[in-house]
């Protein structure tokens, strides 16, 4: 890395394990400066509950970034709306969570930060606070005015991107249009090259229907939509294999010759990935004008403040973001 970079972290729901995980991240040295967008008392109280040392250093945007030393975090303060009891949601803090996300996103857009790593949020409490919120991905897409974003989850061994995300099953077939597939595959291909450093990405594409439609006998979306799009993109030089039946695609004979899988919908691709690497997975938002990674788990309210939360996914998300920073320099 040519110079030390700053990454911004949002711990997420303050009553959940996000603050615990951030405190655990601070127990080791990092080659980047970790700027945490959070309430100071929340972090120091949670560190005390966990019995872990933590020193908060003020964020100085006009000073050169410094590698983070063990036992420290750089604080970009955002005040809680209500005091926090570990494990107990407070509706007003839905506003606090969104404020941290907005500040972190804006800092990435204006060049303050080289990447954003997000902890788990509780969508219900944010909506209960009167803020329409469907997820990080959609929030950052809207705030950054990105034309289109793509959700991808990854472990060290497998990357799975989604053509559609949080849609009911009954709506998915209608959503799989030529325009959507062109856009999603273009973003996936571009970001695999620029953010992951893969010169010629090899992408496996799932069919939509069982047996990838069985030649039109189990649905015609493959024939009518998916195959024509793949043929057009192959003619442009992309390396695309598919559409393949999703129940056989996730085998070494296919995966060993691929850099990513494109699944048509959420529960087609993610169960395999989460079974293979739950707790070590990372959520990446492709198509944003900045790097964003996230943990692949929820708020786990019942574990907050108890010292039982596994920091593995957060470490993986941070390490991946650092690699992506290097690839984009």
Curated annotation (Swiss-Prot):
GO BP terms: pyridoxal phosphate biosynthetic process; pyridoxine biosynthetic process
**Quick one: which residues bind substrate?**
136-137, 274, 283, 292
One GO cellular component term noted in the UniProt record for this chain: cytoplasm
User: Its pathway?
Assistant: Cofactor biosynthesis; pyridoxine 5'-phosphate biosynthesis; pyridoxine 5'-phosphate from D-erythrose 4-phosphate: step 4/5
**Textual note on the cofactor:** Binds 1 divalent metal cation per subunit. Can use ions such as Zn(2+), Mg(2+) or Co(2+).
- Its Gene Ontology molecular function terms? 4-hydroxythreonine-4-phosphate dehydrogenase activity; cobalt ion binding; magnesium ion binding; NAD binding; zinc ion binding
Compartments (UniProt record): Cytoplasm
* Superkingdom assignment: Bacteria
Its keywords, alphabetically, are:
Cobalt, Cytoplasm, Magnesium, Metal-binding, NAD, NADP, Oxidoreductase, Pyridoxine biosynthesis, Zinc
Which E.C. number(s) belong to this protein?
A: 1.1.1.262
Q: Which reaction does it catalyse?
A: 4-(phosphooxy)-L-threonine + NAD(+) = 3-amino-2-oxopropyl phosphate + CO2 + NADH
Cross-referenced SUPFAM superfamilies: Isocitrate/Isopropylmalate dehydrogenase-like
Name its co-factor(s).
Zn(2+); Mg(2+); Co(2+)
- Residue numbers binding a divalent metal cation: 166, 211, 266
Indicate the principal place this protein occupies in or around the cell: cytoplasm
UniProt subunit comment: Homodimer.
**Additional notes on this entry:** The active site is located at the dimer interface.
Instruction: State the family it belongs to.
Output: Belongs to the PdxA family.
**HAMAP family recorded for this chain?**
PdxA (MF_00536)
Q: What does this protein do?
A: Catalyzes the NAD(P)-dependent oxidation of 4-(phosphooxy)-L-threonine (HTP) into 2-amino-3-oxo-4-(phosphooxy)butyric acid which spontaneously decarboxylates to form 3-amino-2-oxopropyl phosphate (AHAP).
The entry's protein name is 4-hydroxythreonine-4-phosphate dehydrogenase
Please report the organism this UniProt entry assigns to the protein. Shigella boydii serotype 4 (strain Sb227)
